[in-house]
Each structure stands twice: as structure tokens, then as C-alpha cells.
Amino acid sequence: MDIIANLLNGTLVFSTALIFAALGGLISERSGIINIGIEGFMVSGAFFSAVTAYYAEAAGFGAFSPWLGLIGAFLFSVIFSSIHAVACIKYGANQVVSGTVINILASGSTFYLVKMIFAGSAETPILTNVFHKVNIPYLTDIPFVGKVIFNAYPTTYVAIALIIVFHLILFRTPSGLRLRSVGEHPNAAATVGVKVNRTR
């Protein structure tokens, strides 16, 4: 039983990045934009997260370094996604082609940058300050479920919370309704005054 619990816990922990990416893809798809550049966003986000955390650690931020790395991943993923958004929404580029270009650009540019920044090394140095698993008191003691869900990294808990938040925003708020309307019926949404391109 412990083996299964550990296996499921590991699956949950390592799927955290995929959950973040999937939520971003969900918003994009719901707004009517095909986004196959998610892999590129993940690659660029992972790279800039590691670089930001490395320099933050070198600057003496200590335990805050991984959190700053997480913010760095978010910011640079926003930059890459903005390229995709401008190309598809403003200039009407083919969404599949744009996403493919983002994937290629992210893979190539990050590989080049890591070699340039770290003197020819193909990877970033190992960080001292990293996220550690957090045990939630009492809940961790629940048989099986406690080991699976309540023994994870802070980012895993954030990802699970965001699933609930995104669901509520999409299906329980006017903003979510507008977002879904521009994806499903953009002409009808425009007729009632929703700014389709701005929403996307």
C-alpha cells in the first residue's frame, strides 16, 4: 500500500508543472486561441526559473530564491505567450504555425543562452535553496490519502488550489462567461458588446 501511495504522490508532485501549463492552455482554448506552444512556454519558464533562482541565491536571497525563480518563470512565460498572442490576434497568423514556432524558438534560444551564461555548460548549476515537501499536520496522518495528497511541495498545493479557482472563475463569474463566449461564439459576443480581441 505504501508503494502505491508513494507512486501516486510522486505522480502528483511531478505533474505540478503540467497542471500550471494545462490551466494556461485551458484559458487560451476557451478564449478561442489554439495553443500548441505550451511546451515552449514550459521550456522557457523552466530555464528562466533556474537562472533567476541561481542569481537570487548568489545575491543572498536564501530560501526566497526558489520563489523568485517561480516568479521569473511566470514573467518569461508571459513574454513568450505575448508573442503568440500578438501574432495570432493582432496579425492573424496561423495559430498552429505560431505555436510550433514558439516551441522551436524556446528550445533553441534556451539551449544557446544556458551555454552562453554558464560558460559552455549544458545545464544550470545545482541550487542549494530549493522547495521542500510540506506535511500538513493531522491531514498527513490520514491513511493512504494523507501520504498521497498532504505530503507535497508548496507549488503542488498552489496548483491544486488554482484548479478550483479557475473553475470558479470560468463557470461562476461574468468574466468567465465572457471568456467562454468569445471562444464559442465570437460574433454573438461582439454583438452584445464584448471586445473579442481584448478578451483573448
Predicted regions and their residues:
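Helix-loop-helix "hairpin" substructures at the membrane interface of multi-pass membrane proteins
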Residues: 148-200
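Membrane-interfacial amphipathic/re-entrant helices at transmembrane-helix boundaries
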Residues: 1-21, 34, 48, 57-68
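Extracellular/periplasmic helix-loop junction at the C-terminal end of a transmembrane helix
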Residues: 107-145
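Membrane-interface helix caps of multi-pass small-molecule transporters
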Residues: 26-27, 51, 55, 79-82, ...
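Hydrophobic core segments of alpha-helical transmembrane domains in multi-pass membrane transport
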Residues: 21-22, 46-50, 107-111, 156-169
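Hydrophobic alpha-helical transmembrane segments
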Residues: 7-11, 40, 44, 67-75, ...
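Alpha-helical transmembrane segments within multi-pass membrane transporters and channels
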Residues: 61-107
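Short, non-helical or kinked segments that cap or interrupt transmembrane helices
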Residues: 26-48, 89-102, 178
